[in-house]
Amino acid sequence: MSTDRDSTRFLTPCQQKSSTVRTASAAASRSLQGDIVECNTAYGGSRQETPKHRQTIEDHGFNAIAKVVIMDEFDELEIPCPAGSTHLRQDLIGAAFTNYTGFVVLNHFKGHMMGGFGGALKNLSIGVASTAGKARIHSAGKTDDAGKVWGDLPPQKDFIESMAEAAGAVVDYMGDRAVYISVMNNLSIDCDCDAHPHPPEMADVGILASLDPVALDKACVDLVYASDPKTSASLRERMETRLGPHILDHAEALGYGAKAYRLVSLDGTEPPSTKRVD
């Protein structure tokens, strides 16, 4: 993996295939001797409360890969959002996040019912936020109460911008201590957290990595639009109807990343085209 940032806009794709993000997670955890980190959710289900969450982690085999830390198990803390944020002043994250000196932010790029798509920025915002922090993001700063947020959701644009602002808080906190990897395989219009996701329609695209999460998400979005419309139409529609790409615009405006990038293939072959196919 190259570490040349090309003015923070360098993007390295890998045309290797991966069957699951868990496979990549296992390799990264073992080679780096790191922990897998997680936070409790803000919606009902087995991952909202720590005891049930730990059982879910065990049931899905993650304890066999590495130590799993639920970062908001014992406490949470606020970190400042970037200057220019319009909805959030502080992001509320799991307190154990501060225990780490470096981060591999591993994402399964796919669609998402609320965010349009889930990639690095969604993982940095919703994934790192505590239960109360997730409520804060979903409500665009109106409440930290997970029991109240779902009955009074803000305009979609405000939610998308709140995700960008929360992600910016985490990126600013990490500084240059992070690398971002997105696995584009089994692309459904729904998130992995959905109990009944729509079957994947897009074939594997590959694995992309960058030191810039905004560039990484932009490249993944571009590769969806460069794919055969017969298989990518549903995901395109999901991203557009949820205003998903707007997170890229707001993140770039906040100054912690850039949408410009260049693709470089690790095996020396010609990188895939990102020219839109209609």
What label would you give each PLM region?
Residues 2-3, 8-9, 15-20, 28-39, ...:
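Extended, low-polarity segments enriched in aliphatic/aromatic residues
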